[in-house]
């Protein structure tokens, strides 16, 4: 009863004014509630919102538009959860939403790999902190279980990754890695 009441309230009070990760998580929660409680209105609101928010919030280089590697990991897990839901209830979610997830999740995994410290930890840009999002290893394991391939970077080979849309540049040489923010101030 409580979850139904909360979802009902949420369906009329989405955090559109905050946008970003707040609104995205609202849409995810409403989608799950809509599927579980077989509420077409909730599912429809959530799908419409996600179809708009995913391309808006995920840049072409795979970064979340808030430019925080920690929030990037959190929204990536949200996207994996939604994809997992689509696998469990294939007739309940649109092919359009599932296709969008299949398009963006690999880019997001690539960005997470590029931005991670050599020990797998999150890089501390913007308001990133340890211990908030699941670890890179856990996210990759989850993604692999859902059928997404992971291509780890070979840190022994020199490599420069220019994430032009987010402004982050990653350089790896002889096992050393430099990650810096070259975006406009």
Predicted region positions:
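Carbohydrate-active enzyme catalytic cores, enriched for enzymes
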Residues: 66-185
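Aromatic-lined, polymer-binding surfaces characteristic
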Residues: 1-105
